[in-house]
Amino acid sequence: MFYDEAKIFVKAGNGGNGAVSFHREKYIPRGGPDGGDGGRGGNVYLRVDPSLNTLLPFSYQRQFRAEDGQPGQGNNKNGRDGADLYIDVPPGTVVYDEATGAVLGDLLEPGEVLLVARGGFGGRGNQHFATPSRQAPRFAEKGEPGEERWLRLELKLLADVGLVGLPNAGKSTLLAAVSAARPKIADYPFTTLEPMLGVVSVPGREGGTFVLADLPGLIAGASRGAGLGHEFLRHVERTRLLIHVLDGSGGLEGRDPLEDFHTINAELAAYSASLAGKPQIVAVNKMDLPEAQANWPRIARALDELGYTAYPISAATGQGVGELIRATWERLQQLPRPERVAPPLRSHRVYTLDRSQERWEAIRLSPHHFALRGPKIERLTLMTDFSNPEAAERYQRLLARWGISRRLLALGIQPGDIVHVAGRELVWEPELAEAEQTRPRRRLTKRERLLKRAGLLEEPEEEIGEQ
């Protein structure tokens, strides 16, 4: 069975915890803190594997987790970083965030990679928190949790030309006649149940080839879910050109080929405006039958008035097929390459200072419940070991230094109220916050006063984790 959609869960590795350790060596009393940092958690990437052409492997495995970073150790030993996880996908895979619907990437080229979950930073060891007034810190940072999310993968086959038409119009027979593909062919509708690709060699054109996609036949109402073809119309979106195959004989039902032509185009337009605007070449098939030969003059005249070029062919006997393929190749040379669903992925990173990461927001949810939001405060919360009194004291000291405590007090927070942040519930204890606000500050030096007057001096802050 052909799988062109999948949902998977990806979880990046957690950062390793920082170590609490003190240097112990003969003849070196009071060696000081030497706890190492935790390792970074492994990232999760999607990678294009040209040997794949379906999302079938994701029907067996849906959850993927990268390796966690290792914890730090004493003697300033840092933990090992977690190994990155690479998940192979076929070319033409579009990646969506399942929660938001946002397009994360469009993977086309072999070897192309897309970062879909970032590993957590490792926590810093206690060596980083030593100060003149706190020479023996007995706390360290916890590792940051890795990102996790559900992804929706959608495969859009990479073909230059797509075959569209009603069921039993002869699309599969045409594909088999011009390529090495061997689709199932039978004299009943919906013989083709899944897309099939074939590489077409152009007669008389040295090295001239293009990829042709055969899709299940469309019927009236396909854009609303009728029939089978609507499930695979996404594969036509990447094509540059459509070959619209008509049954020139009208089939056993005696249909009007021109009505069939308008029916299919109406379904393409209802599904997507981009499909309706794709250039088309019309192939009037089954010209080996007397009914098709009788209908041909009327069909050719009507299509010419509509601005379409029609080619009489018989996929079964090969009549006119070579001329159709050469015309298709020449038309392709005039058409641009299709655009990506998402911008191309960069081979390098550009780092810029993002002040939005430092912003925070305090909200009163109810008389005794408050919430804090913002990347920096949430990250601090996740990396703080609240079971350690010194770590909890540092957390509250930073809240006061950043002005968060002052804002919560202005909102009317009282001792014992609950503060919700990063999925945790913290009980408000204002003693440390008030002490921090009233703690005397050292006098600025002359140089610092000049810098402050010029707006170039910022208040010192403790950094959270590795940058």
From Swiss-Prot:
> What SUPFAM superfamilies does the entry give?
Obg GTP-binding protein C-terminal domain, Obg GTP-binding protein N-terminal domain, P-loop containing nucleoside triphosphate hydrolases
Query: Where is the OCT domain positioned along the sequence?
Result: 352-430
Asked if the Swiss-Prot or TrEMBL record annotates the protein with the keyword Membrane, the reply is: no
One GO cellular-component annotation of the UniProt record comes to:
cytoplasm
Task: List localization entries.
Answer: Cytoplasm
Its GO biological process terms? Answer: ribosome biogenesis
Could you list this entry's UniProt keywords, alphabetically sorted. Answer: Cytoplasm, GTP-binding, Hydrolase, Magnesium, Metal-binding, Nucleotide-binding
This entry's Gene Ontology molecular function terms read: GTP binding; GTPase activity; magnesium ion binding
Q: What is its EC number?
A: 3.6.5.-
Q: Which domain of life is it from?
A: Bacteria
Residues annotated as binding Mg(2+) are S172, T192
Enzyme's top EC category: hydrolase
Positions of the Obg domain: 1-158
Required co-factors: Mg(2+)
InterPro entries assigned:
G_OBG (IPR031167), GTP-bd (IPR006073), GTP-bd_Obg/CgtA (IPR014100), GTP-bd_prot_GTP1/OBG_C_sf (IPR036346), GTP1_OBG_dom (IPR006169), GTP1_OBG_dom_sf (IPR036726), OBG_GTPase (IPR045086), OCT_dom (IPR015349)
Asked if the Swiss-Prot or TrEMBL record annotates the protein with the keyword Membrane, the reply is no
User: Which residues are in the OBG-type G domain?
Assistant: 159-333
Q: What does this protein do?
A: An essential GTPase which binds GTP, GDP and possibly (p)ppGpp with moderate affinity, with high nucleotide exchange rates and a fairly low GTP hydrolysis rate. Plays a role in control of the cell cycle, stress response, ribosome biogenesis and in those bacteria that undergo differentiation, in morphogenesis control.
Q: How does it assemble?
A: Monomer.
User: So what family is this one in?
Assistant: Belongs to the TRAFAC class OBG-HflX-like GTPase superfamily. OBG GTPase family.
What is the name listed in the Swiss-Prot or TrEMBL entry for this protein? GTPase Obg
Upper taxonomic lineage:
Bacteria, Pseudomonadati, Thermomicrobiota, Thermomicrobia, Thermomicrobiales
